[in-house]
A protein has these predicted regions:
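Internal intein/HINT superfamily modules and their associated LAGLIDADG
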Residues: 1-162
Length: 162
């Protein structure tokens, strides 16, 4: 099935695995949040009952609220975890509603994800996994989870063209 997303005169064509889905209902903003879950923070999770949803967290409630705004009617709930991780510090967590389209997005290749990223998606990716070096005034994008091949063949050419 070929899903076509249209928002602000931008078309997003995503080839999926022969399933019906809610894809035609995604806005560009929703799509960008879900795409960046495959690159940076956030995760698309499938439960034992085959319900698939997006979840992310951040210590800054304002950023979680921004992602909630972007998700619009795909937002399900938000909560504060008082003790998280090794340091046991508070963190905010947000979850989307379940949708089959999230399975298709999770299964997209990195190349296809990069081809569908807009400036908003790049900004979300940098906020999730970037770091500003204030002394030398440059950003680092932490992409350690990806192979050297993906860096060489996809990320380097992608950012050279930006």
């Amino acid at each position: 099935i070929l899903h076509i997303f249209t928002h602000d005169n931008i078309n997003f064509n995503i080839m999926c695995n022969n399933r019906q889905s809610a894809a035609s209902n995604l806005s560009n903003e929703q799509l960008q949040v879900f795409l960046t879950s495959q690159l940076g923070d956030g995760h698309i999770h499938t439960t034992n009952s085959h319900s698939t949803y997006y979840v992310t967290n951040c210590k800054y409630e304002e950023y979680i609220n921004y992602k909630i705004q972007l998700l619009g009617d795909f937002f399900k709930n938000k909560r504060k975890l008082e003790k998280n991780g090794f340091c046991q510090t508070p963190i905010w967590e947000m979850r989307s509603k379940s949708s089959d389209i999230l399975v298709d997005i999770r299964n997209m290749s990195i190349k296809d994800i990069l081809n569908h990223l807009t400036d908003l998606g790049i900004a979300l990716w940098f906020y999730d996994d970037g770091s500003l070096h204030k002394t030398d005034l440059y950003y680092n994008l932490n992409t350690h989870k990806f192979s050297e091949e993906i860096h060489r063949e996809l990320f380097v050419p992608y950012f050279k063209d930006k």
